[in-house]
Amino acid sequence: MAADKQQQQAPVAFNPADPPNIKAANFKDMLPVDVITILNQNIDELDYTKYTEDEISEGLKQLFMGTARTMVSLRQRHLKSLVRRSDMFAQNDASTWARPNIGLKRTFPPRFMQPISED
């Protein structure tokens, strides 16, 4: 039971009820699930009437940048377990002649296709 309670508690790196004090740098050792847990725990306490529109916007910007930082951190922690990234641009392969000069591997099919209408 204590393990469940400990698992639900997220490290407090920001207070969603105080947008001017949300800083992306404070999200350094957090996971995305920690951010969601903090937001869910404080959902009923949010009252932004005492803050200006600029303070709220800056707080949201910092929240999004901090959350993105947690996602990058999570990916880096699991780098050895992930599928290797593939090149976005096409290499020399059998269908190189059929692709436009840009050669985006996953964007352009080797031929033009048109759906057949039943009308």
Swiss-Prot record:
GO biological process: viral process
One GO cellular component term noted in the UniProt record for this chain: viral capsid
Primary site of residence: virion
UniProt keyword Metal-binding, yes or no: no
Taxonomic superkingdom: Viruses
Record keywords, A-Z: Capsid protein, Host nucleus, Virion
Subcellular localization(s) per the UniProt record: Virion; Host nucleus
Signal sequence, start to end: none
UniProt entry tagged with the keyword Chloroplast: no
Family to which this protein belongs: Belongs to the herpesviridae small capsomere-interacting protein family.
HAMAP family linked: HSV_SCP_alphahv
Function recorded in the entry: Participates in the assembly of the infectious particles by decorating the outer surface of the capsid shell and thus forming a layer between the capsid and the tegument. Complexes composed of the major capsid protein and small capsomere-interacting protein/SCP assemble together in the host cytoplasm and are translocated to the nucleus, where they accumulate and participate in capsid assembly.
Assembly and oligomerization: Interacts with the major capsid protein/MCP.
Protein name per Swiss-Prot or TrEMBL: Small capsomere-interacting protein
Gene name per UniProt: SCP
